[in-house]
Amino acid sequence: MNTATGFIVLLVLATILGGIEAGESHMRKDAMGRVRRQYCVPVDQPCSLNTQPCCDDATCTQERNENGHTVYYCRA
């Protein structure tokens, strides 16, 4: 086997192994996403509109704090 053929074989092997690893990583990420989605923010705790939902049918509502800043809290 000459150098060019060996290089091509290694390139194909690396591509196959890289694809397998990417697939496994994607599956792990999905499993972690399910775990994270099961978590909810307790009532009367700060929340974000783009992250976990509030627990106990509460909603993430916008309020003003004592400094006049806009904050979000889970309120029932």
Swiss-Prot record:
Main subcellular localisation: secreted
Tissue: Expressed by the venom gland.
Residues of the propeptide: 23-35
Keyword field: Cleavage on pair of basic residues, Disulfide bond, Ion channel impairing toxin, Knottin, Secreted, Signal, Toxin
GO cellular component terms given for this protein: extracellular region
Residues spanning the signal sequence: 1-22
S-S pairs: 40-55, 47-60, 54-74
Entry text on domains: The presence of a 'disulfide through disulfide knot' structurally defines this protein as a knottin.
Function: Toxin that may inhibit ion channels.
Protein name: Omega/Kappa-hexatoxin-Hv1h
Source species: Hadronyche versuta
Classification lineage: Eukaryota, Metazoa, Ecdysozoa, Arthropoda, Chelicerata
